[in-house]
């Protein structure tokens, strides 16, 4: 009986943990990812036009997806490491 209870507790903890964790890439190059904080359940990639041929890329976690503009292209997604 104790083994069954322990198993149920472990399964519950694992399931609860998976319920709110999102992993998003968070560097300009798509190599390193981080676990998003609670409440930020979307990944974001923002490409910012600096000069005619120069762009900055920002990746990370977000709770809302801002709109794109003429100089900023925003892509949001809701699966792990989807902001490549």
Curated annotation (Swiss-Prot):
Disulfide bonds join 24-43, 36-61, 65-76, 77-82. Keywords: Cardiotoxin, Disulfide bond, G-protein coupled receptor impairing toxin, Secreted, Signal, Toxin. Pfam families: Toxin_cobra-type. Its main location: secreted. Gene3D superfamilies: CD59 (2.10.60.10). Expressed by the venom gland. It comes from the Eukaryota. GO terms for cellular component: extracellular region. Belongs to the three-finger toxin family. Short-chain subfamily. Aminergic toxin sub-subfamily. This is Beta-cardiotoxin CTX23. It comes from Ophiophagus hannah. The lineage of its organism: Eukaryota, Metazoa, Chordata, Craniata, Vertebrata.
């Amino acid at each position: 009986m104790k083994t069954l209870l322990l198993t149920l507790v472990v399964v519950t903890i694992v399931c609860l943990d998976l319920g709110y964790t999102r992993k998003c890439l968070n560097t300009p190059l798509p190599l390193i990812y981080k676990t998003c904080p609670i409440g930020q359940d979307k990944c974001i990639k923002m490409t910012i036009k600096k000069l005619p041929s120069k762009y900055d890329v920002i990746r990370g976690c977000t709770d809302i997806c801002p709109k794109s503009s003429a100089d900023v292209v925003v892509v949001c997604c809701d699966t792990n490491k989807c902001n490549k």
